[in-house]
């Protein structure tokens, strides 16, 4: 299936690289989205794959996202952010004077209302696991703190949508039997606290904007990883891009 061609450049904003390294051996910034950039370019799209700190606060990553976009184009863009990349984009648009540069923002599997995994990570029990691992490896712990549910509530209150930007979102509901082990454990934990989820982000947390689409995909499937024959990422990405095409 071919990708629809958009009139404006497409910017891809990645999520936590440290997380993806844990899920996918050898994951690097340039292949976070795997075959998606090439697929988009084959249809004639101008594609900008941004590079921001793999583990960093929303504010820090948003600054780098802005720099990456302005260094690549002077045209308005369609932004697509996966996971934390969607939060970086929202911060950038609202707080860094980038609303005039962005035609639309589509977030995929983005924890707009935080994550119970982040809450657990800074709890007494979690500090012996995830949070301690981040601290001992000298990574930016603010990234994890930003995603706590109470901190995201404050973020949402201080980061309103901008009126001239179209906001869309994609949520995911993954099949735990098809998930890799890490996502399977997280899926069970999140399901207990927030219900349906993609193995890292609940559908309730991922909903944002004027139109919400649900994919039968886990957090990795959404960017073309471990799809097998149970999720056709090209078909779903094509539908998403067709919506942007019609709203331009």
Residue ranges: model-predicted function:
Residues 1-6, 94-97:
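Short amphipathic alpha-helices and their capping/turn segments at secondary-structure boundaries
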Residues 4-75:
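Active-site catalytic motif of lipid deacylating hydrolases and related acyltransferases
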Residues 11, 48, 106, 168-170, ...:
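Hydrophobic/aromatic beta-strand patches that form the interior of the parallel beta-sheet core
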Residues 14, 45, 78, 82, ...:
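Histidine-centered active-site/metal-ligand motif
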Residues 14-16, 21, 82-83, 110, ...:
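Glycine-rich His-Gly loop
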Residues 23-25, 115-121, 126, 178-183:
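Short aromatic-enriched loop/helix-cap "lid" or pocket-rim segments at secondary-structure transitions
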Residues 59-159, 198:
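Serine-dependent carboxylesterase/thioesterase catalytic core
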Residues 161-248:
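C-terminal catalytic-base region of ester-bond hydrolases, centering on the histidine
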């Amino acid at each position: 299936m071919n990708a629809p061609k958009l009139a404006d450049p497409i910017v891809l904003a990645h999520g936590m690289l440290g997380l993806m390294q844990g899920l996918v051996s050898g994951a690097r910034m340039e292949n976070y989205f795997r075959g998606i950039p090439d697929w988009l370019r084959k249809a004639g799209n101008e594609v900008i794959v941004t590079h921001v700190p793999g583990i960093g606060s929303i504010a820090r990553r948003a600054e780098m996202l802005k720099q990456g976009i302005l260094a690549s184009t002077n045209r308005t863009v369609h932004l697509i952010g996966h996971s934390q990349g969607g939060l970086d984009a929202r911060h950038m648009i609202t707080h860094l004077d980038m609303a005039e540069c962005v035609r639309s923002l589509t977030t995929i599997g983005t924890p707009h209302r935080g994550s119970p995994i982040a809450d657990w990570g800074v709890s007494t029990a979690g500090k012996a696991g995830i949070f301690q691992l981040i601290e001992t490896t000298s990574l930016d712990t603010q990234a994890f703190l930003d995603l706590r549910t109470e901190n995201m509530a404050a973020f949402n209150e201080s980061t309103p949508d901008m009126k001239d930007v179209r906001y869309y979102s994609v949520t995911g509901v993954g099949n735990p039997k098809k998930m890799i082990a890490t996502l399977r454990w997280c899926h069970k934990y999140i399901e207990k606290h927030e219900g349906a989820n993609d193995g890292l982000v609940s559908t309730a947390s991922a909903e944002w904007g004027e139109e919400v689409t649900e994919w039968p995909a886990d957090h990795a499937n959404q960017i073309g990883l471990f799809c097998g024959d149970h999720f056709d990422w090209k078909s779903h990405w094509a539908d998403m891009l067709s919506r942007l095409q019609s709203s331009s």
